[in-house]
Structure formats: structure tokens, C-alpha cells
Regions:
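Adenosine-phosphate binding glycine-rich loop
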Residues: 42-151
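Rossmann-like adenosine-cofactor binding region
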Residues: 1-70
């Protein structure tokens, strides 16, 4: 902290720190009725799961002009990396950096789509991300059903 000029604060005081970005990376539901009005950041970008205690918190962030990058889009890179590591371990193959990079590029495209659609549709990012995820899951289910019919 001394080298960068950062200030160390108690965990519960983090919500009151003036910052550009709030990055919840450990505990879920840190964006809740008790903390929402204390956060002054203009963006929330973190890797913790389930950052929004309730969906209406995402709506309130949107109404305040706070950019919220949905947690499962932000932390998807970790899952992608682990998938490649596990595949290499389970198959005796090598870690596939090219596959990881391709998937990460698609993840960035998804985040771009979430942000662009949020702006153009006037809807919170968490709603857009959920809609994209549901559409992809439904498409995968339909593809699987077609494969099973063909088998």
C-alpha cells in the first residue's frame, strides 16, 4: 500500500471508499440494500459469484448509471482455463492455449454484446446477460435433442 499510495481499510469500510471501480472478488451478495448507497464507483467489475443480493439491485445500479459487468461473464475466463487444464489432465494431452484464447475472445464478444444491448435496449446488464445465457442453453438443449433423435 505504501508503494502505491493505496489505503488499507477494514472490510466493512470498503463500500465507503471513493473509487472508480468496485471489484467484488470473493463474497457474494455484497451489492445489497445495506451497501448499495455507500458505493460511489461508476463500474462494478468483479469475479465473485452472485454479487447482486437481489435482481432489483442490478436495476438500481442501471438507473444510477453504474456499469455492472455480470459476474458470470467476468469470471468465465477462470472456468475456461480450468476446462482446458482438466481436459489435458484427463486425456494425457497438452494444455490448449489456442482453444482458451478462442473461448476468451468469444467471452469478450459476449461482454461487448451485453453492454451494447443494455445501452440500446435500456435494460440492466444482468437482465441482458441472463437472456443471452438462457437462449444459449435452450439452443444447446435443442441441438442435443436433435442429436438424440438422429441416433
Amino acid at each position: 500500500a505504501a508503494r502505491t499510495g493505496a489505503e488499507i481499510v477494514a472490510p466493512d469500510a470498503i463500500y465507503d471508499v471513493k473509487a472508480d471501480i468496485y471489484a467484488p472478488c470473493a463474497l457474494g451478495a455484497t451489492l445489497n440494500p445495506q451497501t448499495l448507497d455507500r458505493i460511489t464507483a461508476k463500474a462494478v467489475v468483479g469475479a465473485a459469484n452472485n454479487q447482486l443480493a437481489t435482481a432489483d439491485i442490478g436495476q438500481k445500479l442501471f438507473e444510477r448509471g453504474v456499469l455492472y459487468a455480470p459476474d458470470y461473464v467476468v469470471n468465465g475466463g477462470g472456468i475456461i482455463n480450468v476446462a482446458s487444464e482438466l481436459n489435458a489432465r484427463n486425456t494425457g494431452g497438452a494444455y490448449d492455449a489456442a482453444w482458451v484464447e478462442t473461448k476468451l475472445s468469444r467471452l469478450m464478444e459476449t461482454l461487448d454484446e451485453v453492454l451494447e444491448r443494455s445501452a440500446s435496449e435500456g435494460r440492466p446488464t444482468h437482465e441482458i446477460a441472463d437472456a443471452i445465457a438462457e437462449a444459449r442453453i435452450n439452443a444447446a438443449r435443442a441441438d442435443k435433442a436433435e442429436q438424440l433423435k438422429a441416433a
